[in-house]
């Protein structure tokens, strides 16, 4: 089992986190409150593939990244 561990050290308000395996279509998501000691742990399958990770802050800022699990 794999997990996405996120640590946020600024108060961004509520943050939406989504992870999608672009090869299988599997998706996971959660919402968490950010702050000085805020953390989120999102379990994912860890199946091989290219993944997209997206964070959307309460103010509407969007941060997107990609990673590969072989």
Predicted regions and their residues:
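Short proline/glycine-enriched turn/loop motifs at strand-loop junctions of beta-rich domains
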Residues: 9-15, 23, 47-48
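Short, surface-exposed loop/turn motifs with a glycine/proline- and acidic-biased composition
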Residues: 34-57
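C-terminal tail/sorting-segment detector
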Residues: 52-70
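Solvent-exposed serine/threonine-rich low-complexity stretches and specific carbohydrate-binding patches
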Residues: 26-35
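Structural beta-strand segments of beta-rich domains
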Residues: 1-6
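Generic short beta-strand
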Residues: 16-18, 53
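Glycine-centered tight beta-turn/hairpin loop motif at sheet-sheet or coil-to-beta transitions
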Residues: 12, 25, 58-60
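Short, glycine-anchored, charge-dense loop/turn motifs used at functional sites
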Residues: 21-27, 51
